[in-house]
Every structure is written in structure tokens, then in C-alpha cells.
Amino acid sequence: MTGTTWHLLRTESTSPAENMAIDEAIANWVAKGELKPTLRFYSWAPHAISVGRFQRATRDLDRDALEANNIPVVRRLTGGRAVLHADELTYSVILPESTPALPTNIIESYRLLTEGVRRGYRELGVPAEFSVPLTEEDREALRKPKSAVCFDAASYYELAVDGKKIAGSAQVRHQGAVLQHGSIPLSVDDEVLFDCFAMDETEKQEAKTRFSEKAVALNDTLKRFVSFDEVAAAFETGFKDAFSLTFEPLVFTKEQQAEIDLLVKKYESDEWVWKR
């Protein structure tokens, strides 16, 4: 997978449903050999909550609070727990499952692809390292999460700084393609975040405490403001260096855009979002 040319795509301020539709569409085309492997950077407008494919959104989320805060919900193709996509850069990396040197084991392929993210952080001066749950307490927290929030615990080979999770990613094998996407928070408003979940006040305060102990945003780590453009440039360099890549821009054809538009309807539908 090294020394090759990939597509590079930036789609800023895109709707939640379209963001997920684009990732799935690219995965479909990459699997069929119609597109090269693709690295994508994107942001969300409006801000939104995404839930994992198998997450029980009807149980975990407070729909009244979401409506009051004008925060839509979208269900991802990948698994995992809920993420508030607000002031962040989201990345996705999509390549054929048959790619040489790509491990068939999901955890090991996750570690390999996340190396591009780790090097991106290094470009920004952030000493991010892979997290491996070492204690039984850490492993139990992964088996039995204490909340529906993604960032309150680091899984295998997620990235952390001083023990705090700095990025949350998920991976899926889809029709012959590997899709990994993840959230890179620039800043976090934990008041808005925890208002979105079905918790009483005691549970909410406990979750906020865990979150402050287990997660950190990029601005807080660097103690300065970082922009989407700065982070995207650093992560592009990180992937280039990790895999000796060159990039060419991706522009969708009319036919491809029509396929994306069809998938948008799926991701907007209550049948998909609230199916569990």
C-alpha cells in the first residue's frame, strides 16, 4: 500500500447525511475498482451527533434535548458509540480490503491506518501515541462502557496524549472495502455534549468527570487555536509520510453525485437513524 497514488478530497461544512453518504459511496466505488484509495477530510454543518451502526439511539439519546438544541442525528456505517461533531476535523480513509500489506485482522489494520493520524498529530507538535488497555479495569471499561459517549474511554490503538484520548475512530469492512473514519476535536463543549444523552443529573456529572479525565481536544493540548486548514494540512503530510503516498484531487462526476444523493436519503431517514 506504500508508494502509490491516492485520491484526496476535502468537503467542508457538509450536512450529516451527506457526510455519511459520501463515505459509503466512496467505499462502494473503491471496492469495485472505480476509484483509487481515498483520504478525505470534512466538517459538519450543522453540528450533529453520529451514533454507531448498532448503537441503541432510542435508549441512549434525549430526543427532546436534541431538538431543543437543533442537533440532528445520523447513524454511521461503522460501529462504536456516539460522537458530537462540532468544532472538529473528521477524516476518512478508504481502500480495498485486498490491499497488499493491509492486515486482515481489524485491530491490526486499525493500528496501521491510524499511523497516518499519529504522524499528523506529530506534524502539529502533539506527541500522540497508541493506547493499549493494560489493566483489567481498562479492559472492563471497554467491555461494559459506562456511557454512550465515544470519548470517555480509549480502545485498542486509539491515540492518546498523557493518557487522554485525543481522537476517536471506527472501522468497517464493507463490500470489499475498508472504511475507517474518525473525529479529531479541535475544541469540545461538554455542556452541549452531555445534554444530548438520556441521563439524570447524577449520571451526567459523573460522565463529565470521566470525560475530563479521559479525553482532551487539540486546542487544549497545544494551548492555542488551530484551524481546520492547519490540521488538514498536517494530516495530509502525516499520511504521505506514513505510507509514501502522492495525492490527486477527487472530483465527483454527475453520475457519482447522483449515487451520493440517493444515499443521502437513506441517512436522512428515520428508518435508518432510529432503527434501534
Curated annotation (Swiss-Prot):
Sequence ranges assigned to domain BPL/LPL catalytic in this UniProt record: 33-247
Reaction(s) this enzyme catalyzes, per UniProt: octanoyl-[ACP] + L-lysyl-[protein] = N(6)-octanoyl-L-lysyl-[protein] + holo-[ACP] + H(+)
Pathway linked to the protein: Protein modification; protein lipoylation via endogenous pathway; protein N(6)-(lipoyl)lysine from octanoyl-[acyl-carrier-protein]
Alphabetically ordered keywords of this record: Acyltransferase, Transferase
EC number: 2.3.1.181
Additional observations: In the reaction, the free carboxyl group of octanoic acid is attached via an amide linkage to the epsilon-amino group of a specific lysine residue of lipoyl domains of lipoate-dependent enzymes. The reaction proceeds via an octanoyl-thioester enzyme intermediate.
Subunit structure: Monomer.
Name of protein: Octanoyltransferase LipM
Originating organism: Exiguobacterium sp. (strain ATCC BAA-1283 / AT1b)
Organism lineage string: Bacteria, Bacillati, Bacillota, Bacilli, Bacillales
Gene name of this polypeptide: lipM
